[in-house]
Regions:
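C-terminal domain-closing interface element
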Residues: 52, 57, 61-67, 314-368
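N-terminal leader/propeptide and maturation segments of large enzyme subunits in energy/redox metabolism
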Residues: 42, 47, 53, 61-82, ...
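Active-site cavity-forming subdomains of large catalytic enzyme subunits
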Residues: 48-50, 55, 60-159, 170-171, ...
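Mature N-terminal segment immediately following signal peptide/propeptide cleavage
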Residues: 1-11
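Glycan-recognition surfaces in beta-rich domains, encompassing non-catalytic CBMs
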Residues: 336-468
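Catalytic phosphate/nucleotide-handling subdomain of diverse soluble enzymes
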Residues: 9, 13-15, 20, 24-32, ...
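Accessory "access/gating" subregions that flank catalytic or transport cores
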Residues: 97-98, 105-115, 124-135, 143-148, ...
Length: 468
């Protein structure tokens, strides 16, 4: 119950700052509002703010309808056919699923340039809340559902968040929860190394979260996958954003406000990060320990359904508790009246996987042209992503062939509306060298536009520094 309440409050607290501070912290002199009635106001006028929660609830509803052994395709179809809009890895996965690329291929980086993004990380709360004290069972759930939209570090973010929620039920020591949950992540992964660095920096600078933030920026604020943020200040990568969650938990020292505030002031995805931190902390401490200052606004919405769902917070509390009891019994525990026995699990690492291995972003080339006027595009490297968008009639679906060096790479279908393709075209794993890209629009429409913004170019080695 505390987990769902905490993340709802965290989203509302950080919401006004989301991605307004990119590669920059929110300084202490910048006020962050939490006005009376603000959560209810968001429910009515900005329900999309709670996307990370109603995404969770999509999966919770499938478990409730089909049982705890529901097949992955059921989750994939529920997610892909939902009425809400999606972004980044989630939207790329929706497109893939609707075009026959099912999980886990729908989240694989070769099919999803956003595979390392934060998407499953902000949706994985349910996996830990339904597996109290059983982090490995949470990881099994994350293996199935997290690979719908993510891979590698993007998947690890959800595995780690789920494990922290799971362990939050059996330990009231935040440091233990953070450290033990990290044992679910392979030590040789970037994700593990970054979280471990944050833990070590916290020990080195126990009273200065801003120093840890600066160390983290220096070493880990590099995104190589997301076509919207790579080589730009915008970073929606799971690694850096989960570091901000951990910073809030460690430096917050069990204080609800301080935990949320630090995760928010780290910047970037500054509503989802405090939501994760506050949800985990409220799971450790319990619903009844959330300060009244924060609960006053929450109580106004506990009986209101989240957008795009038939579930309110009060219903979610009950449903999530029911699923947790089922998982406890499934994994050897027992229930006798009010007495519940959990067979606790020692965390073990999931398998190692890494996206974009051996790839180095070396430049973004501005295009700013419609596809019909682009002609050919020449670049040197091993991979390329074309960003942009399509506009046209509601039911229009463009069909475009992409060629590299005269060989067809794909015939892309480009729908308009909520089923759109996030990135227009991409091709990785080309031999290093000069390549020529051309396109053939098979069904042009005078009322449709396919606009290319820019091209993100990759090589198999870092760009040499030209001024040395």
């Amino acid at each position: 119950k505390g987990g769902w309440a905490g993340q709802t409050i965290g989203v509302a607290y950080g919401g006004p700052t989301e991605f307004r501070y990119r590669s920059a912290m929110i300084q202490d002199y910048v006020p962050i509002s939490y006005a009376d009635g603000c959560i209810k106001n968001y429910f009515k006028h900005a329900p999309g703010l709670f996307d990370d929660i109603y995404m969770d609830l999509t999966f919770v509803e499938v478990f409730d309808r089909l049982g705890i052994d529901a097949p992955v395709d059921s989750f994939a179809h529920a997610f892909a056919h939902a009425d809400y809009g999606l972004w980044h890895a989630n939207q790329a996965a929706r497109y893939n699923i609707l075009n026959g690329i099912m999980p886990p291929a729908s989240g694989h980086w070769l099919n999803n340039p956003h595979a390392d993004d934060i998407d499953y990380q902000i949706e994985a709360d349910f996996a830990g809340l339904m597996t109290p004290g059983m982090p490995n069972t949470a990881s099994e759930i994350s293996d199935k559902i997290g690979h719908i939209m993510n891979y590698g570090d993007g998947w690890y973010g959800g595995v780690y968040i789920g494990a922290m929620y799971s362990l939050a039920f059996i330990s009231d020591d935040i440091n233990i929860v953070v450290q033990e949950a990290l044992k679910t992540i392979p030590e040789n992964s970037r994700f593990h190394q970054c979280m471990n660095d944050v833990i070590q920096w916290h020990r080195q600078y126990p009273n200065d979260w801003k120093q840890t933030w600066a160390e983290c920026e220096k070493k880990w604020n590099q995104d190589i996958g997301c076509p919207e943020g790579t080589l730009l200040p915008y970073n929606i990568d799971a690694v850096i954003n989960c570091a901000y969650v951990v910073m809030g938990l460690l430096y917050g020292e069990g204080d609800f406000y301080k935990t949320m505030d630090i995760s928010t002031r780290c910047g970037q995805d500054s509503d989802c990060n405090p939501a994760s931190a506050a949800g985990i902390l409220a799971t450790i401490q319990g619903y009844s320990q959330i300060p009244e200052y924060w609960m006053k606004n929450l109580r106004e919405v506990e009986n209101l359904n989240f957008a795009y769902t038939d579930m309110s917070l009060n219903q979610t509390y009950q449903t999530s508790f029911k699923h947790a009891l089922q998982m406890i019994k499934r994994n050897g525990g027992s229930i006798s009246g009010d007495n519940i026995t959990i067979v606790c699990q020692t965390p073990v690492p999931v398998r190692f996987e890494q996206a974009f291995e051996g790839m180095f972003p070396i430049g973004r080339q501005e295009i700013r042209k419609e596809l019909r006027h682009l002609g050919s595009f020449t670049f040197e490297g091993t991979g390329i992503v074309f960003t942009g968008y399509i506009r046209g009639a509601k039911n229009y679906v463009a069909q475009v062939e992409m060629y590299v060096d005269g060989k067809i790479i794909e015939r892309a279908v480009l729908p308009t509306g909520k089923n759109h393709r996030v990135d227009l075209f991409w091709k990785y794993q080309l031999p290093e060298g000069k390549h020529i890209v051309t396109f053939k629009w098979l069904n042009p429409d005078s009322n449709a536009q396919i606009h290319c913004n820019d091209a993100l170019i990759y090589s198999n080695r870092p760009l040499p520094i030209p001024h040395q």
